[in-house]
Amino acid sequence: MSSADFNFGDFTTTYTSPTIPAYPDTLGQLQPIQPNPQAAYPPVSQHHASHHVQHPHQPGYVLSNPPQLSGNKRKASDAMSVPPTPGARVMSFEEASRLAAEEDKRKRNTAASARFRIKKKQREQALEKSAKEMSEKVTQLEGRIQALETENKWLKGLVTEKHGSKEDILKLLREFSAHAAKVSKDAAAAAADKAEAAADKADAERAREESSFCVSTSSPSSDESVDTDNKKRRKD
């Protein structure tokens, strides 16, 4: 099937419109916007090209003075490519263990300081509570002392009103002290008598024991004399 079957025209010819003017084809004579890269930049030498094989760049852009980063990167890559020695692995393990020990020590110190702060706070609270209780007890005792002093004054007043002046009270006090001294003296004498009687009794018991001991030691000799007499009589 071809275009002739559908009665289509020939599209290879240029279409010309009577209303649109024709423009000349001068696009091939236009100058390029960017100049020739080979003319703008110097050619790359073989020495620089060998250094920049691993770093491709856009065509026509060559650095006249390459930076020093390439050498540093190469050294870093070489250092990373070298496998670590066993000593380095041991040092790294020791370093890791040391860091772990320091971290554990730091945590334990933190926990200990927290416990110390808690105990200190509890101790301070207990001391404050005990101080408050002691102050309350002191206040109560002071009130009791004042009440006792008031009662003592009241009793003194009653005694002076009943027995007269202070001289009578002093006389009664002297009599009471004399009676108390006499009672204590009698008690001391009775105690001395009891002690002397107990000592005499102990001496008597000791003498009795000594006499019984002497009798028991002398009895075997008399028995022996009796036995010897009986033996002599039998021989005769």
Curated annotation (Swiss-Prot):
This protein's UniProt keywords: Activator, DNA-binding, Nucleus, Stress response, Transcription, Transcription regulation
SMART domains with a match to the protein in the record: BRLZ
GO CC annotation: nucleus
Region feature Disordered, mapped onto this chain: 26-89, 189-236
One protein family per Pfam: bZIP_2
Region (Basic motif): 105-137
Keyword Transcription: yes
Induction behaviour: By sulfur deprivation.
Regions of compositional bias (Low complexity) in chain numbering: 212-223
Cell wall biogenesis/degradation recorded as keyword: no
Chain ranges of the bZIP domain: 99-162
Biased composition (Polar residues): 28-37
Disulfide links within the chain: none
Function, in words: Turns on the expression of structural genes which encode sulfur-catabolic enzymes. Binds to sequence elements upstream of these genes.
Subunit structure: Binds DNA as a dimer.
Name recorded for this polypeptide: Regulatory protein cys-3
